[in-house]
Amino acid sequence: MQKYEKLEKIGEGTYGTVFKGRNRETLEIVALKRVRLDEDDEGVPSSALREICLLKELKHKNIVRLYDVLHSEKKLTLVFEHCDQDLKKYFDSLNGDIDMAVCRSFMLQLLRGLAFCHSHNVLHRDLKPQNLLINKNGELKLADFGLARAFGIPVKCYSAEVVTLWYRPPDVLFGAKLYTTSIDMWSAGCIFAELADAGRPLFPGSDVLDQLMKIFRVLGTPTEESWPGVTHLSDYVALPHFPAITSWSQIVPRLSSKGRDLLQKLLVCRPNQRVSAEQAMQHPYFTDSSNH
Protein backbone atom coordinates (compact mmCIF):
# COMPACT_ATOMS: atom_id res chain seq x y z
CA MET A 1 0.00 0.00 0.00
CA GLN A 2 3.04 2.27 0.20
CA LYS A 3 2.38 3.56 -3.31
CA TYR A 4 -1.02 4.89 -2.24
CA GLU A 5 -2.01 7.06 0.68
CA LYS A 6 -5.41 6.26 2.16
CA LEU A 7 -7.65 9.31 2.57
CA GLU A 8 -11.26 9.34 3.77
CA LYS A 9 -13.78 6.52 3.46
CA ILE A 10 -16.13 6.93 0.49
CA GLY A 11 -18.60 4.18 1.34
CA GLU A 12 -19.42 0.50 1.48
CA GLY A 13 -19.39 -1.43 -1.77
CA THR A 14 -20.76 -4.88 -2.51
CA TYR A 15 -17.43 -6.50 -1.72
CA GLY A 16 -15.90 -4.26 0.92
CA THR A 17 -15.02 -0.73 1.98
CA VAL A 18 -14.13 1.95 -0.55
CA PHE A 19 -11.65 4.69 0.33
CA LYS A 20 -10.48 7.76 -1.47
CA GLY A 21 -6.74 7.48 -1.99
CA ARG A 22 -3.82 9.31 -3.51
CA ASN A 23 -0.98 7.98 -5.61
CA ARG A 24 2.11 9.16 -3.68
CA GLU A 25 4.17 9.49 -6.86
CA THR A 26 1.75 11.22 -9.23
CA LEU A 27 -0.60 12.72 -6.57
CA GLU A 28 -3.53 11.43 -8.62
CA ILE A 29 -6.72 10.79 -6.64
CA VAL A 30 -7.91 7.18 -6.89
CA ALA A 31 -10.56 4.93 -5.34
CA LEU A 32 -9.22 2.08 -3.19
CA LYS A 33 -11.58 -0.90 -2.95
CA ARG A 34 -10.68 -3.18 -0.10
CA VAL A 35 -12.12 -6.59 -0.91
CA ARG A 36 -13.16 -8.39 2.25
CA LEU A 37 -11.98 -11.99 2.19
CA ASP A 38 -13.62 -14.74 4.20
CA GLU A 39 -11.81 -15.53 7.43
CA ASP A 40 -11.71 -19.26 6.76
CA ASP A 41 -10.73 -18.72 3.17
CA GLU A 42 -7.38 -19.67 1.73
CA GLY A 43 -6.87 -16.03 0.82
CA VAL A 44 -7.66 -14.90 -2.70
CA PRO A 45 -8.60 -17.72 -5.08
CA SER A 46 -6.16 -17.78 -7.98
CA SER A 47 -9.08 -17.88 -10.41
CA ALA A 48 -10.37 -14.60 -8.96
CA LEU A 49 -6.92 -13.05 -9.24
CA ARG A 50 -6.65 -14.11 -12.87
CA GLU A 51 -10.07 -12.63 -13.62
CA ILE A 52 -9.20 -9.38 -11.90
CA CYS A 53 -5.89 -9.01 -13.69
CA LEU A 54 -7.67 -9.41 -17.03
CA LEU A 55 -9.84 -6.43 -16.12
CA LYS A 56 -6.77 -4.17 -16.12
CA GLU A 57 -6.80 -4.57 -19.90
CA LEU A 58 -10.30 -3.08 -20.25
CA LYS A 59 -9.54 0.49 -21.30
CA HIS A 60 -12.49 2.58 -22.46
CA LYS A 61 -13.72 6.03 -21.51
CA ASN A 62 -17.05 4.63 -20.28
CA ILE A 63 -15.44 2.01 -18.05
CA VAL A 64 -13.90 2.85 -14.68
CA ARG A 65 -10.21 2.05 -15.12
CA LEU A 66 -8.63 -0.55 -12.85
CA TYR A 67 -5.07 0.72 -12.35
CA ASP A 68 -3.66 -1.71 -9.88
CA VAL A 69 -4.27 -4.92 -7.95
CA LEU A 70 -2.54 -5.01 -4.56
CA HIS A 71 -2.52 -8.42 -3.00
CA SER A 72 -1.27 -9.46 0.40
CA GLU A 73 -2.07 -12.47 2.54
CA LYS A 74 -5.48 -11.47 3.86
CA LYS A 75 -6.12 -8.35 1.84
CA LEU A 76 -6.93 -7.55 -1.73
CA THR A 77 -7.09 -3.89 -2.71
CA LEU A 78 -8.25 -2.81 -6.14
CA VAL A 79 -7.10 0.63 -7.24
CA PHE A 80 -9.64 2.33 -9.51
CA GLU A 81 -9.99 5.64 -11.26
CA HIS A 82 -11.86 8.04 -8.97
CA CYS A 83 -15.21 9.56 -10.00
CA ASP A 84 -17.15 12.31 -8.26
CA GLN A 85 -20.50 10.61 -7.74
CA ASP A 86 -22.66 7.68 -8.72
CA LEU A 87 -25.96 7.76 -10.59
CA LYS A 88 -27.90 7.05 -7.40
CA LYS A 89 -26.51 10.21 -5.74
CA TYR A 90 -27.07 12.13 -8.97
CA PHE A 91 -30.74 11.08 -8.93
CA ASP A 92 -31.05 12.24 -5.32
CA SER A 93 -29.87 15.71 -6.36
CA LEU A 94 -32.43 16.06 -9.17
CA ASN A 95 -35.59 16.75 -7.15
CA GLY A 96 -37.66 14.65 -9.51
CA ASP A 97 -36.80 16.33 -12.80
CA ILE A 98 -34.23 15.40 -15.46
CA ASP A 99 -33.21 17.02 -18.73
CA MET A 100 -34.07 14.46 -21.40
CA ALA A 101 -30.89 15.31 -23.33
CA VAL A 102 -28.94 14.20 -20.23
CA CYS A 103 -31.04 11.02 -20.07
CA ARG A 104 -30.14 10.25 -23.68
CA SER A 105 -26.45 11.08 -23.24
CA PHE A 106 -26.12 8.86 -20.14
CA MET A 107 -27.96 6.00 -21.85
CA LEU A 108 -25.72 6.14 -24.91
CA GLN A 109 -22.60 6.16 -22.72
CA LEU A 110 -23.94 3.20 -20.74
CA LEU A 111 -24.47 1.26 -23.98
CA ARG A 112 -20.99 2.17 -25.27
CA GLY A 113 -19.40 0.85 -22.09
CA LEU A 114 -21.50 -2.32 -22.27
CA ALA A 115 -20.77 -2.91 -25.96
CA PHE A 116 -17.03 -2.58 -25.30
CA CYS A 117 -17.04 -5.06 -22.41
CA HIS A 118 -19.34 -7.50 -24.17
CA SER A 119 -17.04 -7.46 -27.21
CA HIS A 120 -14.29 -8.62 -24.81
CA ASN A 121 -16.60 -11.32 -23.41
CA VAL A 122 -16.86 -9.63 -20.03
CA LEU A 123 -20.29 -9.41 -18.40
CA HIS A 124 -21.22 -7.13 -15.55
CA ARG A 125 -24.09 -9.17 -14.02
CA ASP A 126 -24.88 -6.62 -11.31
CA LEU A 127 -25.58 -3.31 -13.07
CA LYS A 128 -27.44 -0.72 -10.98
CA PRO A 129 -27.28 3.06 -10.47
CA GLN A 130 -24.79 2.63 -7.60
CA ASN A 131 -22.15 1.27 -9.95
CA LEU A 132 -22.61 3.82 -12.70
CA LEU A 133 -20.24 6.64 -11.86
CA ILE A 134 -20.36 10.19 -13.16
CA ASN A 135 -17.50 12.66 -13.26
CA LYS A 136 -17.53 16.47 -13.42
CA ASN A 137 -17.55 16.45 -17.23
CA GLY A 138 -20.82 14.55 -17.41
CA GLU A 139 -19.05 11.35 -18.41
CA LEU A 140 -20.69 8.15 -17.24
CA LYS A 141 -18.50 5.16 -16.41
CA LEU A 142 -19.38 1.59 -15.48
CA ALA A 143 -17.79 0.37 -12.25
CA ASP A 144 -17.27 -3.13 -10.82
CA PHE A 145 -17.24 -4.74 -14.27
CA GLY A 146 -16.28 -8.40 -14.12
CA LEU A 147 -16.13 -8.53 -10.32
CA ALA A 148 -19.30 -10.63 -10.11
CA ARG A 149 -17.59 -13.39 -12.05
CA ALA A 150 -14.43 -13.21 -9.96
CA PHE A 151 -16.12 -13.09 -6.55
CA GLY A 152 -19.72 -14.14 -7.16
CA ILE A 153 -22.66 -11.88 -6.31
CA PRO A 154 -23.28 -12.15 -2.59
CA VAL A 155 -26.86 -12.28 -1.34
CA LYS A 156 -25.99 -9.58 1.15
CA CYS A 157 -23.30 -6.96 0.91
CA TYR A 158 -20.88 -7.57 3.73
CA SER A 159 -22.32 -4.41 5.29
CA ALA A 160 -25.55 -6.51 5.64
CA GLU A 161 -27.35 -4.38 3.07
CA VAL A 162 -29.36 -6.69 0.83
CA VAL A 163 -28.19 -6.80 -2.77
CA THR A 164 -30.96 -5.30 -4.88
CA LEU A 165 -33.11 -7.41 -7.19
CA TRP A 166 -34.59 -4.43 -9.02
CA TYR A 167 -32.31 -4.77 -12.04
CA ARG A 168 -32.35 -8.59 -12.33
CA PRO A 169 -33.99 -10.16 -15.39
CA PRO A 170 -36.79 -12.74 -15.05
CA ASP A 171 -34.57 -15.57 -16.35
CA VAL A 172 -32.10 -15.01 -13.49
CA LEU A 173 -34.95 -14.62 -10.96
CA PHE A 174 -36.26 -17.99 -12.22
CA GLY A 175 -32.87 -19.56 -11.53
CA ALA A 176 -31.20 -19.55 -14.97
CA LYS A 177 -27.51 -20.31 -14.49
CA LEU A 178 -26.26 -19.72 -18.02
CA TYR A 179 -25.49 -16.03 -18.07
CA THR A 180 -25.13 -14.20 -21.36
CA THR A 181 -24.75 -10.53 -22.28
CA SER A 182 -28.57 -10.34 -22.22
CA ILE A 183 -28.47 -10.11 -18.40
CA ASP A 184 -26.81 -6.68 -18.68
CA MET A 185 -29.22 -5.53 -21.38
CA TRP A 186 -32.20 -6.09 -19.08
CA SER A 187 -30.48 -4.08 -16.34
CA ALA A 188 -29.73 -1.34 -18.88
CA GLY A 189 -33.44 -1.21 -19.74
CA CYS A 190 -34.39 -0.82 -16.07
CA ILE A 191 -31.81 1.96 -15.71
CA PHE A 192 -33.07 3.67 -18.90
CA ALA A 193 -36.62 3.79 -17.48
CA GLU A 194 -35.24 5.12 -14.20
CA LEU A 195 -33.24 7.81 -16.03
CA ALA A 196 -36.34 8.85 -17.98
CA ASP A 197 -38.28 9.14 -14.73
CA ALA A 198 -35.60 11.12 -12.87
CA GLY A 199 -34.59 8.32 -10.53
CA ARG A 200 -37.84 6.50 -9.79
CA PRO A 201 -37.11 2.77 -10.16
CA LEU A 202 -39.27 0.84 -12.62
CA PHE A 203 -39.56 -2.49 -10.77
CA PRO A 204 -38.78 -1.94 -7.05
CA GLY A 205 -39.51 -5.46 -5.83
CA SER A 206 -39.18 -6.41 -2.15
CA ASP A 207 -38.27 -10.07 -2.79
CA VAL A 208 -37.97 -12.47 -5.74
CA LEU A 209 -41.71 -13.16 -5.99
CA ASP A 210 -42.68 -9.50 -5.71
CA GLN A 211 -39.99 -8.65 -8.27
CA LEU A 212 -41.42 -11.13 -10.79
CA MET A 213 -44.97 -9.89 -10.16
CA LYS A 214 -43.95 -6.27 -10.75
CA ILE A 215 -42.26 -7.23 -14.04
CA PHE A 216 -45.12 -9.39 -15.34
CA ARG A 217 -47.79 -6.80 -14.46
CA VAL A 218 -46.11 -4.61 -17.08
CA LEU A 219 -44.71 -7.08 -19.62
CA GLY A 220 -47.28 -9.85 -19.24
CA THR A 221 -46.68 -13.27 -17.68
CA PRO A 222 -44.53 -15.47 -19.93
CA THR A 223 -45.77 -18.83 -21.19
CA GLU A 224 -44.11 -21.75 -22.98
CA GLU A 225 -45.44 -20.20 -26.21
CA SER A 226 -43.91 -16.77 -25.64
CA TRP A 227 -40.75 -18.10 -24.01
CA PRO A 228 -39.94 -21.75 -24.77
CA GLY A 229 -38.27 -23.48 -21.82
CA VAL A 230 -39.34 -20.97 -19.17
CA THR A 231 -41.29 -23.56 -17.15
CA HIS A 232 -38.19 -25.79 -16.97
CA LEU A 233 -35.99 -23.19 -15.25
CA SER A 234 -34.92 -24.45 -11.81
CA ASP A 235 -36.77 -21.81 -9.75
CA TYR A 236 -39.77 -21.38 -12.04
CA VAL A 237 -43.05 -20.69 -10.27
CA ALA A 238 -46.43 -20.36 -11.95
CA LEU A 239 -47.74 -16.83 -11.42
CA PRO A 240 -51.09 -15.19 -12.19
CA HIS A 241 -51.58 -14.57 -15.89
CA PHE A 242 -51.19 -10.83 -16.45
CA PRO A 243 -51.64 -9.38 -19.93
CA ALA A 244 -48.91 -7.06 -21.25
CA ILE A 245 -49.70 -3.37 -20.91
CA THR A 246 -50.46 -1.57 -24.15
CA SER A 247 -49.55 1.97 -23.20
CA TRP A 248 -45.89 2.54 -22.35
CA SER A 249 -46.50 6.28 -22.31
CA GLN A 250 -48.07 5.78 -18.88
CA ILE A 251 -44.97 3.99 -17.59
CA VAL A 252 -42.42 6.50 -18.94
CA PRO A 253 -44.41 9.65 -19.79
CA ARG A 254 -41.33 11.81 -20.43
CA LEU A 255 -39.78 9.45 -22.97
CA SER A 256 -40.30 10.05 -26.70
CA SER A 257 -41.93 7.35 -28.85
CA LYS A 258 -38.50 6.31 -30.15
CA GLY A 259 -37.20 6.11 -26.59
CA ARG A 260 -40.16 3.94 -25.63
CA ASP A 261 -39.46 1.71 -28.62
CA LEU A 262 -35.85 1.21 -27.49
CA LEU A 263 -37.00 0.51 -23.92
CA GLN A 264 -39.37 -2.21 -25.13
CA LYS A 265 -36.55 -3.84 -27.08
CA LEU A 266 -34.43 -4.02 -23.90
CA LEU A 267 -37.16 -5.15 -21.51
CA VAL A 268 -38.07 -8.49 -23.10
CA CYS A 269 -38.65 -11.42 -20.75
CA ARG A 270 -37.16 -13.98 -23.13
CA PRO A 271 -33.39 -13.40 -22.92
CA ASN A 272 -32.41 -14.25 -26.50
CA GLN A 273 -34.91 -11.70 -27.83
CA ARG A 274 -33.34 -8.75 -26.03
CA VAL A 275 -31.49 -6.27 -28.19
CA SER A 276 -27.67 -6.24 -27.87
CA ALA A 277 -25.69 -3.17 -26.75
CA GLU A 278 -24.28 -2.80 -30.26
CA GLN A 279 -27.77 -2.89 -31.80
CA ALA A 280 -29.22 -0.54 -29.17
CA MET A 281 -26.55 2.09 -29.92
CA GLN A 282 -27.79 2.19 -33.54
CA HIS A 283 -31.38 2.88 -32.49
CA PRO A 284 -33.03 6.00 -34.02
CA TYR A 285 -33.59 7.34 -30.48
CA PHE A 286 -29.94 8.41 -30.48
CA THR A 287 -29.84 9.91 -33.97
CA ASP A 288 -33.09 11.88 -34.14
CA SER A 289 -32.30 15.40 -32.89
CA SER A 290 -35.97 16.17 -32.22
CA ASN A 291 -35.97 13.35 -29.70
CA HIS A 292 -36.44 14.38 -26.11
Swiss-Prot record:
Biological process (GO), any one: cell division
Gene this protein is translated from: Cdk5
One protein family per Pfam: Pkinase
Stated family: Belongs to the protein kinase superfamily. CMGC Ser/Thr protein kinase family. CDC2/CDKX subfamily.
Modified residues (Phosphoserine): 159
Native source species: Glossina morsitans morsitans (Savannah tsetse fly)
Protein name per UniProt: Cyclin-dependent kinase 5 homolog
Domain of life, per lineage: Eukaryota
Function: Probably involved in the control of the cell cycle. Interacts with D1 and D3-type G1 cyclins. Possible regulator of neuronal differentiation and/or development.
EC code(s) of this entry: 2.7.11.22
Residues modified as Phosphothreonine: 14
Cross-referenced PROSITE patterns: PROTEIN_KINASE_ATP (PS00107), PROTEIN_KINASE_DOM (PS50011), PROTEIN_KINASE_ST (PS00108)
Domain Protein kinase intervals: 4-286
GO terms for cellular component: cytoplasm; nucleus
Residues that coordinate or bind ATP: 10-18, 33
SMART domains named among the record's database cross-references: S_TKc
Active-site residue list: 126 (proton acceptor)
